[in-house]
Swiss-Prot record:
The lineage of its organism: Bacteria, Bacillati, Cyanobacteriota, Cyanophyceae, Oscillatoriophycideae. InterPro entries: Class_I_gatase-like, GATASE, GMP_synth_C, GMP_synth_GATase, GMP_synthase, GMPS_ATP_PPase_dom, Rossmann-like_a/b/a_fold. The keyword Metal-binding does not apply. It catalyses: XMP + L-glutamine + ATP + H2O = GMP + L-glutamate + AMP + diphosphate + 2 H(+). This is GMP synthase [glutamine-hydrolyzing]. Keywords: ATP-binding, Glutamine amidotransferase, GMP biosynthesis, Ligase, Nucleotide-binding, Purine biosynthesis. ATP binds at residues 246-252. The active site is at 105 (nucleophile), 192, 194. GO terms for molecular function: ATP binding; GMP synthase activity. Its EC number is 6.3.5.2.
Length: 542
């Protein structure tokens, strides 16, 4: 029996007079970002406690903070020293807002410096794990065990505290590992409670959120879905919406959410550019069109995408051409199917943060963005498209999208699908993309996914895939000399894709995968395993 998704309500349904959004925002924690690699992680950790959080620039004014009226503020870490000439500084007025504040690493040092204390270069820098000795186990450090592990990453130290502050904890090398001014509800920690290595970190964050800021747990999956549907209906009214479906968890969740909110006013378009994994286009159509009765317009553009990549070997040029062709096909099909009033996009919160505020340059204090490679997801739709945007997922992190997906009934194969780049297999073929090389890689990649699934290990990896190299190697098969392609196996573990470790896969599984690829995939005679972590490498090869 097909699973039914509730469509738009009858006009007799009542709309709540008070928005959930207002209730959620009244419990918000704001993170002021000073360029830390962990700022987003702090926000995620707070949201895991069912309290909403946002990451804002350290330049946010006191007046803006007053208008937001958060229950608490966290000052993030950062790469600078507070005594540097161009070190980023928050407004001094922040200390007079009467809002509880927690400074983390650089944030704590900034608190100390701005309130009259002293920060200097530490005699001994502290990086990695340290034992946290607790001097005052109340308030911030309630339920944090004495001598538990804390993750340190600092070269400076607070050597003199402002008036009204006391030491809550220390390490062997850091006299002021945690501090507090209880009267003003100002707290600081020299370590990073948000990272998994800090054993008592989650307890500390919960203490700040619930005991010090007195937040209520209003940020839940159910609350988000309810509010998102209400906002979609209010914004769209009786207009039509177009969504470019990719088959990933983001666009699939967006499709389900929109269909639940506005029903047949939504048109989903799937552009098959020919670079998806084996069986994926067919399975996508089966799930949406047949299983859940969400109509999808299928556009077969395989030949024209392949034609665009003829003779192209540069990875950035591949991305550019694929993106350009995607826009061309999208415009043609939207004109044919239209008119539409809205374009739905699966923008996530990290995209919002990245576009609003990039990293802090440690030399100048200015925020800059360094491009490692063009973003994998094929987007970049032209600015002159005649659509208004609707982005219901723009407040969510990836892990939150998966929770929403599960709550609204998406199949687990989509919910827990490994991340897949927008250009697909085209950037896992090093060098020119041809139909022959696509078949080789598609077949090899299928073996990888098939075997880890058989072993019940699919969900043990963040990603698991094959890469086809543009070289050949000599081999021997059936007493005959072969000269064929090597395939690289890339299996990695990660929490969020920002950093990643190569997976310590059992040798017998690697052997099975290797034997199957060499025997089943024509054109391959060698299999190698990539043991590079991120950093220094990236997850994808291109």
């Amino acid at each position: 029996m097909a699973t039914q998704i509730p469509s738009k309500p009858s006009t007799s349904e009542t709309v709540p007079t008070e928005s959930l959004k207002e209730r959620i925002n009244r419990q918000m924690i704001v993170i002021l970002d000073f360029g830390s690699q962990y700022s987003e992680l702090i926000a995620r950790r707070i949201r895991e406690t069912n309290v909403y959080s946002e990451v804002l620039s350290y330049r946010t004014s006191a007046e803006q903070l007053r208008q937001l009226a958060p229950k608490g503020i966290i000052l993030s870490g950062g790469p600078n020293s507070v005594y540097d000439k161009n070190a980023p500084q928050c407004t001094q007025e922040i200390w007079d807002l009467g809002i509880p504040i927690l400074g983390v690493c650089y944030g704590m040092q900034l608190m100390v410096q701005q309130l009259g204390g002293k920060v200097e270069r530490a005699k001994r820098a502290e990086y990695g794990k340290a034992s946290l000795h607790i001097d005052d186990p109340t308030d911030l450090l309630t339920n944090v065990e004495d001598n538990s592990i804390a993750w340190m990453s600092h070269g400076d130290s607070c050597i003199e505290l402002p008036d009204g502050f006391k030491i809550l904890a220390h390490t062997d090398n850091t006299p002021c590992a945690a501090i507090a001014n209880h009267e003003q509800k100002l707290f600081g920690v020299q370590f990073h409670p948000e990272v998994v290595h800090s054993v008592g970190g989650i307890a500390l964050i919960r203490n700040f959120v619930y005991h010090i800021c007195e937040c209520e747990p209003t940020w839940t999956t159910e609350a988000f879905v309810e509010e998102a549907i209400r906002e979609i209906r209010a914004k769209i009214g009786d207009k039509r919406v177009l969504l470019a479906l990719s088959g990933g968890v983001d666009s699939s969740t967006l499709a389900f959410l929109l269909h639940r909110a506005i029903g047949d006013q939504l048109t989903c378009m799937f552009i098959d550019q020919g670079f998806m994994r084996k069986g994926e286009p067919e399975r996508l159509m089966e799930i949406f069109d047949h299983q859940f009765h969400i109509p999808v317009v299928y556009v077969n553009s395989r030949e024209q995408f392949l034609e665009q990549l003829k003779g192209v070997t540069d990875p950035e040029e591949k991305r550019r051409l694929i993106g350009h062709e995607f826009i061309k096909v999208f415009e043609e099909e939207s004109n044919r199917l239209g008119p539409f009033d809205y374009l739905a996009q699966g923008t996530l919160y990290p995209d919002v943060i990245e576009s609003a505020d990039s990293n802090v340059d440690p030399q100048t204090g200015e925020r800059v963005a360094v491009k490692i490679k063009s973003h994998h997801n094929v987007g970049g739709l032209p600015k002159n498209l005649r659509f208004k945007l609707v982005e219901p997922l723009r407040k969510l992190f990836k892990d939150e999208v998966r929770k929403v997906a599960r709550s609204i009934g998406l199949p687990e194969e989509i919910v827990r699908r490994h991340p897949f780049p927008g250009p697909g297999l085209a950037i896992r073929i090093i060098g020119e993309v041809t139909s022959e090389r696509l078949k080789i890689l598609r077949d090899a990649d299928f073996v990888v996914r098939d075997e880890i699934s058989k072993q019940g290990m699919y969900h043990d990896f963040w990603q698991a895939f094959a890469v086809l190299l543009p070289v050949r190697s000599v081999g021997v098969m059936g007493d005959q000399r072969t000269y064929a392609h090597p395939v690289v196996l890339r299996l990695i573990t990660s929490e969020d894709g920002m950093t990643a470790d190569w997976a310590k896969v059992p040798y017998d599984l690697l052997e099975i995968i290797s034997n199957r690829i060499v025997n089943e995939v024509r054109g391959v005679n060698r299999v190698v395993y990539d043991i590079t972590s991120k950093p220094p490498g990236t997850i994808e090869w291109e």
